[in-house]
């Protein structure tokens, strides 16, 4: 388990700072399977997880739902046959916060 996966999310208000370019470089290096996407001007973390069938993809999605509820931080999730696309960003600040990197790392632990 990575250092990030062991951290707790903090409450993120609309005036919370987005990660800086330096923080982004440091944090993304800790979750190398994730990429940064920009949609409608909003920076987001995204990863596609592959599975052997829909049932396994759905089981992963349900584990992720439990994780998101426990941490009060919710991703975009697209569940399809054989894959789940997970997108993390902080809605309140319309961008990336350290919480998103923490949750991405925690999402990776669901495969263990």
Curated annotation (Swiss-Prot):
Protein name: Putative pterin-4-alpha-carbinolamine dehydratase
SUPFAM superfamilies the UniProt entry points to: PCD-like
Chain coiled-coil ranges: none
Keywords from the named record: Lyase
Family: Belongs to the pterin-4-alpha-carbinolamine dehydratase family.
Top class in the EC scheme: lyase
GO biological process: tetrahydrobiopterin biosynthetic process
InterPro entries xref list: PCD_sf, Pterin-4-alpha-carb_dehyd, Pterin_deHydtase
A molecular-function term among this protein's GO annotations: 4-alpha-hydroxytetrahydrobiopterin dehydratase activity
Catalytic activity: (4aS,6R)-4a-hydroxy-L-erythro-5,6,7,8-tetrahydrobiopterin = (6R)-L-erythro-6,7-dihydrobiopterin + H2O
EC number: 4.2.1.96
Keyword presence, Cell cycle: no
């Amino acid at each position: 388990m990575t250092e990030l996966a062991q951290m707790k999310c903090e409450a993120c208000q609309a005036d919370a700072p987005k990660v800086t370019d330096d923080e982004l470089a440091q944090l993304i290096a800790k979750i190398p399977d994730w990429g940064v996407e920009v949609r409608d001007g909003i920076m987001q973390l995204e990863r596609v997880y592959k599975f052997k069938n829909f049932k396994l993809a759905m089981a992963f999605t349900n584990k992720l739902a439990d994780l998101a509820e426990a941490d009060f931080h919710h991703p975009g999730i697209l569940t399809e046959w054989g894959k789940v696309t997970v997108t993390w960003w902080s809605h309140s600040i319309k961008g990336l916060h350290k919480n998103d990197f923490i949750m991405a790392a925690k999402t990776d632990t669901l495969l263990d």
